[in-house]
A protein has these predicted regions:
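Small-side-chain structural scaffolding
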Residues: 45, 61-63, 100, 131
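The phosphoinositide-binding surface of pleckstrin homology
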Residues: 37-52
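Conserved beta-hairpin
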Residues: 48-77
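Soluble periplasmic/extracytoplasmic beta-strand elements of cell-envelope proteins
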Residues: 40-42, 61-62, 68, 103
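Acidic, Ser/Thr- and proline-rich intrinsically disordered linker/docking segments
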Residues: 1-22, 26-34, 52-53, 73-147
Length: 147
């Protein structure tokens, strides 16, 4: 229930963010939390690159081990993305007139979250950056990186 509580808190704090079905999307993330994982920060948005597509709401949870992105399908099934610290490359924030976008660049793909209240962007950037920096420090560098 920590994910849903934090998602609702985020939505209340930043009401211009477009997000639907917070409970069902939060349940996807809750289902995949490991017993030793704790939720540090949660935000919501649309997992797409288009401001006019408002039907792909997801809940993004930053834990003490990874970033989880949960989306519940309308009829059946769900989708979950997980970003481990070693997969994380970069973070890009774009602010528009009303909404903003957050792009998490990973080794495999770019994850874009849109229709987020632009007032929330600095808070999201701070939480993702600080979490990923702290988590990356825990992973030892490979021999290839040391050369």
């Amino acid at each position: 229930m920590a994910v849903l509580k934090n998602a609702k808190r985020f939505k209340k704090k930043f009401p211009l963010t477009i997000a639907w079905r917070l409970k069902s999307n939060s349940d996807v993330v809750e289902k995949h939390l490991n017993p030793d994982e704790e939720v540090k920060y949660v935000f919501v948005g649309q997992k797409n690159n288009r401001f006019y597509d408002i039907f792909s709401t997801c809940v993004i949870a930053i834990t003490n081990k990874r970033i989880l992105i949960g989306r519940k399908r309308v009829i059946f099934g769900y989708m979950l993305d997980s970003v481990m610290p070693y997969m994380y490359n970069d973070l890009n924030i774009k602010s528009g007139f009303i909404w903003g976008k957050v792009t998490i660049d990973t080794i495999k793909e770019e994850l874009v979250f849109s229709n987020i209240d632009k007032a929330a962007l600095s808070e999201i950037e701070t939480n993702i950056s600080e979490s990923m920096i702290a988590l990356k420090r825990k992973y030892p560098k490979s021999e290839k990186d040391e050369k």
